[in-house]
Amino acid sequence: MRAHATSTITVDPRGPLYDDLAQALALGAVVRVDEHQPWNSLDVADVSTYSARVFLAEHGINSADDWTAALGEALNPSGNDIDSVLGFRADLMRTGETPTTGRWRAEMHEWLHDTDQTDDAHDAVDRIITAVDDIETMFTSAGLLEPGIKIRSVAGHRLSWAVSVARWGSSSGYGDYQAVRQALLAVRDLAGRHFVDWNEYAASTIAGFALEADDHTAAITTYLPPVATLLVAADSPWRNLTFPTDLDFAL
């Protein structure tokens, strides 16, 4: 993993470093490190209010209400074809046995047949399973996954995006400090329900980037350096903050 840790982590000295808000911001650190921006800033660096609103408009967000709705969607880290296919395997794994790719594929197709799904659904399942198998092989080779460990969801990718939506809301003025703070803490709480540590979160996040991309190999090439750096660098928030489980910062 250290061989891939070639990125640089930057910090905003005015931003949170060790509290629950810092934990929330650290969940969006992959994109920030990739873009050479401070991981702990509430705003997007070097972006005017106008530029932030132009960016959000490109994602269909043109008002405070739109921003709130986009946050709600981002905070629902499940529901598409990728989640369904990974969730199907996760259910098979509840017996304590990890199914082979062949069994996963066969039982998924059997379920699709039994529920009268379309040929397109069968094709989508084949594409996703093949991509997941490739991605897990690359992750194991890079040291991101231990041999035999599988990706259970891409919720990390959605939560990372939710942090970005919160930040853009701050930069655009669509969200005031309290609204942005509450959004970030909601991301933090969800992360604690889905993952047990930064490593599991990291694998889910980069897998989501890869599976959403047209070229999953190129996406991994892009995001593996910031992920590896966050996992191993001494100055990383992922090394200096515990993962946000429920009781880290009791009120």
Question: What role is predicted for each listed range?
Answer:
Residues M1-Y177, Q182-L251:
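Polar/charged low-complexity regulatory segments
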